[in-house]
Curated annotation (Swiss-Prot):
SUPFAM superfamilies linked to this entry: Tetrahydrobiopterin biosynthesis enzymes-like
Primary location class: cytoplasm
Binding site for substrate: V80, E81, S82, H222, E223
Name of this chain's protein: NADPH-dependent 7-cyano-7-deazaguanine reductase
Species: Burkholderia cenocepacia (strain HI2424)
Length: 276
């Protein structure tokens, strides 16, 4: 299914009852082919979706609320278009479920079917809300650099690294809050923070910041932007190990946080940043 056929940018009709058919899958293959990925993926990882506007009725008709987190594997053939996800979650509001577990099971079944892979689902009930953490991405801030730039479309030529043959490899974690891209259907801006961890030739910090800023006028879904960043750094700077994690601010009650890596490491924390 193409994004142009999704609910984005169209008049919205809110479902009165639970409706799994509202989920609109978008194949990852098209965007990945544009990046030169036609066979085995050069990374693995997860898309972490947090849903803050989930409510349903219990068996006696009393409203219940929860925060839902979905872990979508990067190898899934599809992503779910975000507005369709919002409408799908909204369809739970006037539907009765016997338990929290029943809601979780339905969410897992439906979203897994739309993505074409097993999706993990966690629900946090109100009595656990106080346990949820808020934190910023850890690392050395690239935003400390005072520099000029005038490139606002992705340009991997901005990236460079030290000569790997003549200098020892380094291990660094770098972060920036200056990531912005735009929805390919509506043109609405998507604001994010990005964390880049690598082992290899030292990456030029100023060039990396200019590269991140260069996404400012780019149109692409969150997941596609992170994969482009990962591949451009991998090809231009040739790190031995690389991980890219972005946390985007929420829209429509959802935030999307893609993570891509080429080496085994723990799942990143799902702590909200201040802007989220």
């Amino acid at each position: 299914m193409n994004p142009e056929h999704s609910p984005l940018g169209k008049a919205t009709v809110y479902a009165a009852q639970y409706d799994a058919s509202l989920l609109f899958p978008i194949p990852r293959a098209g965007a990945r082919e544009q990046l030169g990925i036609t066979s085995a993926l050069p990374f693995f990882g997860t898309d972490i979706w947090n849903a803050y506007e989930l409510s349903w009725l219990n068996a006696r008709g009393k409203p219940q609320v929860a925060i839902a987190t979905f872990y979508v594997p990067a190898e899934s053939p599809n992503i779910v278009e975000s507005k369709s996800f919002k409408l799908y979650l909204g369809s739970f509001a006037q539907s009765k479920f016997d338990s929290v577990d029943a809601v979780r099971d339905v969410l897992k079944r439906d979203v897994s079917a739309a993505c074409g892979a097993s999706v993990s689902v966690q629900l946090v009930s109100p009595h656990d809300f106080a346990k949820l953490e808020m934190d910023e991405l850890d690392g050395l801030s690239l935003d400390r650099l005072d520099l000029d730039t005038d490139v606002y479309e992705p340009d991997p030529s901005l990236l460079s690294a030290a000569d790997g043959e003549n200098e020892a490899p380094v291990e660094e974690t770098l972060v920036s809050d200056l990531l912005r891209s735009n929805c390919p259907v509506t043109g609405q801006p998507d604001w994010g923070s990005v964390q880049i961890h690598y082992v290899g030739p030292q990456i030029d910090h100023a060039g990396l910041l200019r590269y991140i800023i260069s996404f400012r006028n780019h149109t692409g879904f969150h997941e596609q932007c992170v994969e482009r960043i990962f591949l451009d750094i991998l090809h231009a700077c040739k790190p031995v190990k690389l991980a890219v994690y972005a946390r985007y601010t929420r829209r429509g009650g959802l935030d999307i946080n893609p993570f891509r890596t080429n080496y085994n490491q723990p799942m990143p924390d799902n702590a909200r940043t201040a802007r989220q």
